[in-house]
Amino acid sequence: MVKKSLRQFTLMATATVTLLLGSVPLYAQTADVQQKLAELERQSGGRLGVALINTADNSQILYRADERFAMCSTSKVMAVAAVLKKSESEPNLLNQRVEIKKSDLVNYNPIAEKHVDGTMSLAELSAAALQYSDNVAMNKLISHVGGPASVTAFARQLGDETFRLDRTEPTLNTAIPGDPRDTTSPRAMAQTLRNLTLGKALGDSQRAQLVTWMKGNTTGAASIQAGLPASWVVGDKTGSGDYGTTNDIAVIWPKDRAPLILVTYFTQPQPKAESRRDVLASAAKIVTNGL
């Protein structure tokens, strides 16, 4: 009886010590990550915002997560999601074709410019917006759902009170410091991206389609993805604008692990500053190290 009690006590004590000792590296690691992000930001000369959600345990790493950042083309995820949501009640919607005119062309239209005087389906426009960041495609999607205010209204339906889309392409990319137009916070975008890609914000087939399009993105190799192990699967949407604004938002599938949601926003004080995708890659490496 005494031996059994002693054994139970020993096991409990060992477990307690393990938990106590284990908690020290956890807190230390959190502080270490914050310090590394702060140092990355200092060296970059800009302002960095990061939000990571580990869906395995709902733990988060947050850095300037409630500050506003210009979304630039990361807002295309919300516009496409709004169209997908609409398609739930209109089954043939994605096959609907939209006319492309020369007057529609703006500063970046790698896919749409090939269809001038022709048409593209809403599915094709969605893929072009997400996978090639085509700005004509984005504008057509925004127009289809009723304008920027309607995209914002869709975000509100999802419970996102921070996202706001005020303009179309390319003016939504001005990213003027302190300008609230076309902005969100890393925390808000991370939660919304989780709801859209892993949650119940969209129907099963619509969610699967969004994820498929994001996995097929062609613009993100030097951003978040560059800071991750090669075996991890990434679906992302990049964005860039004035003031060297450089963004990427991603849903990530580590090998044999639960998915991660990662939002990285970066902007600089100089209007003509160069994009810094390397900063996003470094941030991704810092927050996922050890996972």
Curated annotation (Swiss-Prot):
Changing N109K: Significantly reduces catalytic efficiency with respect to cefotaxime. A beta-lactam binds at K76, S133, E169, S240. Changing N107D: Significantly reduces catalytic efficiency with respect to cefotaxime. Residues 1-28 form the signal peptide. Changing R167H: Significantly reduces catalytic efficiency with respect to cefotaxime. Its main location: secreted. Keywords: Antibiotic resistance, Hydrolase, Plasmid, Secreted, Signal. It comes from the Bacteria. Belongs to the class-A beta-lactamase family. Monomer. PANTHER family: BETA-LACTAMASE, BETA-LACTAMASE-TYPE TRANSPEPTIDASE FOLD CONTAINING PROTEIN. This is Beta-lactamase CTX-M-1.
